[in-house]
Every structure is written in structure tokens, then in C-alpha cells.
């Protein structure tokens, strides 16, 4: 699992937006749960703002999460966590969440941090 790289997403990762959204939708259907829909533009913007975490196995998408702040940056949440099913059970979600926490602390050092499932 260490060969999978987890890092802050940027404009180079926009090509993964449709895959990310498809993976989230498939996971929700399998679980039979509703999930907040995110538009391609929203996910793309998170990448351009460097407020997203992506995990890649070479050039293959493995996982994703993003951060969102509110109340004048007093609060920050990580949300939209998804790990491709073939990569589950190996601690990848933990690595993505850890990177999201580090990014949150870097970007919003005084904020209270939450994890949200929507």
C-alpha cells in the first residue's frame, strides 16, 4: 500500500473528476445510502484551490477527500472521503484523512476541525 501516493490535488488532477464522482455514486448505491451530490465544477474548484486530497496508484485513481471552511474560517471539515473498493482494508482512508488534517492545519491553523459524512 505504500506505493500509493497521497498528496494535495491541483490542476494536474482535474482529469480524475469524473472518476471521483462516479466512484462516490457507485459506493452510495452499493451501500443503499443517500449521498450529497457534488458537481464536477465543485470538485474541480477544490482541486484548483488546493483544498483536496487525492490518492493515486501510479496514474490510477485510488481515493479522494476535500476540505471546506466556514464561519470566517473558524471551522474546517473534511468531506467527500472515498476509497476505491479494491484499495479498501489497507489503511488508505486513514492516510487520506491524515493528509486532509495536515492540510487543514496548514491552511486554517486556528480552526476547529470536523469530519463530515454527507
Stretch-by-stretch model annotation:
Residues 1-38:
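Short amphipathic alpha-helix that is part of the acyltransferase structural core
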Residues 2-4, 50, 111:
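A structural micro-motif
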Residues 7-9, 81, 86:
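Short strand-loop junctions, especially beta-strand C-caps/beta-turns
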Residues 19-23, 42, 95, 99:
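Alpha-helical elements of Rossmann-like donor-binding domains used by nucleotide-donor carbohydrate transfer enzymes
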Residues 25, 31-83:
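A conserved beta-strand-loop-helix scaffold within acyl/acetyltransferase catalytic domains
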Residues 83, 89-104:
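Conserved acetyl-CoA-binding loop-helix of GNAT-fold acetyltransferases
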Residues 107-108:
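A structural signal for short coil/turn segments at secondary-structure junctions
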Residues 113-118:
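Conserved beta-strand-loop-alpha-helix junction that forms the acyl-donor binding cleft
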Amino acid at each position: 500500500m505504500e506505493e500509493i501516493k497521497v498528496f494535495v490535488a491541483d490542476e494536474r488532477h482535474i482529469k480524475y473528476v469524473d472518476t471521483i464522482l462516479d466512484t462516490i455514486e457507485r459506493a452510495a448505491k452499493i451501500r443503499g445510502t443517500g449521498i450529497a451530490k457534488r458537481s464536477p465544477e465543485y470538485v474541480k474548484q477544490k482541486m484548483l484551490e488546493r483544498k483536496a486530497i487525492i490518492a493515486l496508484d501510479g496514474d490510477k485513481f485510488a481515493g479522494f477527500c476535500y476540505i471546506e471552511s466556514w464561519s470566517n474560517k473558524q471551522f474546517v471539515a473534511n468531506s467527500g472521503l472515498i476509497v476505491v473498493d479494491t484499495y479498501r482494508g489497507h489503511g488508505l482512508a486513514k492516510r487520506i484523512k491524515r493528509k486532509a488534517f495536515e492540510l487543514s492545519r496548514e491552511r486554517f491553523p486556528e480552526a476547529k476541525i470536523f469530519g463530515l459524512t454527507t
